[in-house]
Amino acid sequence: MRSKVAQRIQAETPQEVRIFVRQYTDIVLRINEILQAKGYTQKELAERMNKRPSEINKWLKGQHNLTLKTIAKLEAELGEPIIQVRRAS
């Protein structure tokens, strides 16, 4: 059972913040899933993308906001989709 403090904090957290945290978490989990499947380390990904390992680490720890452009670059480098959006028909 959650404490009253945790319940109050959750109740006071704006919906867009909850959505952001959920989506960011899903994206990071997907990136880590792809890295593991391909046998890549964060350092190897950094080298492949000409980035510092610390920058990759910040992306995957939520310390740096991932832009759509960054996600597209990650998808191109990893050869796998990270996010999927239903396309308009």
What are these regions (language model features)?
Residues F20, R52, S89:
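Conserved N-terminal glycine/acidic-rich loop preference
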Residues Q42, P53, L68-I71:
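Helix-turn-helix DNA-binding elements, focusing on the entry/boundary residues of the two helices
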Residues L29-R48, K73:
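Short basic helix-loop element that most often maps to the first helix and adjoining turn
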Residues M49-N65:
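Recognition helix of helix-turn-helix/homeodomain-like DNA-binding domains
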Residues G39, V85-S89:
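Short, charged recognition helix plus adjacent turn
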Residues K69-Q84:
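DNA major-groove recognition helix of helix-turn-helix/homeodomain DNA-binding modules
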Residues K38, M49, L60, E77-L78:
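Core residues of bacterial helix-turn-helix
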Residues M1-E33, K38:
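N-terminal flexible/basic segments that precede or flank functional cores
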